[in-house]
């Protein structure tokens, strides 16, 4: 049960954040509410995939012999192994890049890259800490940081690119300016 505590704290934090911003979300259109609620649901899924003690193996055996630091398996060598999780991480973070563009439309690309690296590094640091504290049994991998950041930036670039097409009419109602600056 203790292994689930970090995930439960994370989910509780998301709901507290949502409640604390309810005065702002009350001003949102129905399309903006869809953006906010789907972003929260997406964050819950990412939390589950990265911080919950799951027994799901989305990839086969790792091709890398990790360093063991404490009880955490750690890979600090970039691109040593490119298993299916390499591509899964890119796909997992693309929606986050899209949500960042919808929720914080004023962010410039450099800050988007930095935000993606910070979020990815934060996930890996949490996995390392939770491996030590509660035995989460997750790999800490530099490839995850790189591929997550790439997926984050790629998702942002997709929505920016679509904003320069006729699809902009569809995207615009979902953009939130409530949380900007």
PLM regions with names:
Residues 1-138, 156-181:
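Bulky hydrophobic segments
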Residues 136-146:
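Non-cytosolic membrane-interface motifs at loop->transmembrane helix junctions
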């Amino acid at each position: 049960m203790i292994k689930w505590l970090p995930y439960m704290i994370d989910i509780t934090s998301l709901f507290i954040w949502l409640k604390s911003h309810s005065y702002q979300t009350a001003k949102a259109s129905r399309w903006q509410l869809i953006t906010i609620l789907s972003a929260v649901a997406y964050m819950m899924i990412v939390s589950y995939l990265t911080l919950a003690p799951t027994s799901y193996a989305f990839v086969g055996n790792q091709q890398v012999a990790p360093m063991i630091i404490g009880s955490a398996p750690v890979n600090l060598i970039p691109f040593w192994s490119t298993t299916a999780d390499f591509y899964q991480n890119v796909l997992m973070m693309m929606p986050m890049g899209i949500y960042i563009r919808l929720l914080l439309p004023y962010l410039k690309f450099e800050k988007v890259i930095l935000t993606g690296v910070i979020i990815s590094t934060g996930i890996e640091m949490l996995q390392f800490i939770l491996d030590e504290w509660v035995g989460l049994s997750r790999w800490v991998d530099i490839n995850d940081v790189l591929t997550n950041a790439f997926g984050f930036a790629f998702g942002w670039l997709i929505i920016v690119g679509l904003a320069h097409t006729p699809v902009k009419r569809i995207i615009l109602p979902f953009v939130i300016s409530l949380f900007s600056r």
